[in-house]
Amino acid sequence: MKQLSQKAHAAAFHAEFFGNTTQKRFVLGINEFADAVANRTNLDGFIDEYTTATEYRGKPVLKLAQVPAGSMVISTVTQARPKTAMNKLLRLNDVVSMDYFAVADASHFQLPQVQALADTQKEYASHPEKFEWVRDLFADQESREVFNRVMEFRLNANLRAMRFFDYTADQQYFEPFVNFEPGEVFVDGGGFDGYTTEEFIKRCPQYGSVHFFEPTETTLIKAKAQLSKHRDIHFHPVGLLDTEQTLSFDADAGSACKISETGSVQINVDALDNRVTESVSFIKLDLEGAEPKALEGMKWHIQEDHPKLAVAVYHDPAHFWQVPEIILGVRNDYKVYLRHYTEGWTETVMFFIPK
């Protein structure tokens, strides 16, 4: 019997799950995508290993071990560990499962696609030549493979393309090609709780200094406590952007905080070129979508210091080409690498290493 293609398999699963099946139907996860599925069909329940709730939307909440044999399950785990979630479902006896990305794709817009994937499909359709340009930039084959797999996932809702990736956040921003010497000056742009700065110090104990940028007061207080045992850390209570100004900020999103017109908190932002006068040697940026504007505000440092850079490009698909366009527009003597640190759409980092 001929094996169905990934899209045909998803279409068949979608038709059965939302048809007149006699099988019990569940979703793994309690979130906006689980709600979207529940709005389209009468589910038999939800599955969640991490809640104490026993009921949601009037339906029972089960643990994985309680899922009846013969059931159908859609996994709505979509961010850091969707592969792990699917593997757990695949281990269940006589349970047919499918990831939400594929089911949403097969629904032909009856279910909302994960925004990162929908945005990538739109951006690629508008600027295919930009993505081809980026693919040709990379300094090694691994970067090209990472790019191809991430794009296959984003463009075709094909989670199988991510089977080569694991959740490796502890390695993020630090790769064998990112070499450190005594006296390094590190800029932690989007420092959050201080974890990345601590990882930098582990790898470069003879550093010169750290410039730590975190705009939310409560988070900065926690970071200062976390980093109190370390020397020569300059805490900047601002976000990084291209100019000095005050903006609204959504502070309720944890490490995914982002600039927002309806944000609950006012924050101050400024350009790195305005805030730091000493030469810097390594810049890390994870600014929840503000990376291109922040790069515009550090062109002097890029030109004069020729620092290593590690820049998150996953927040907006246009950043895959906008970030290298900005940096290489200042000076083009960089090797460019790409690495990915989760099983899903988050945590893709582009590196710029001086030639």
Locate predicted features:
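Phosphate/nucleotide-binding beta-alpha loop and adjacent structural elements of enzyme active sites
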Residues: 1-41, 49-355
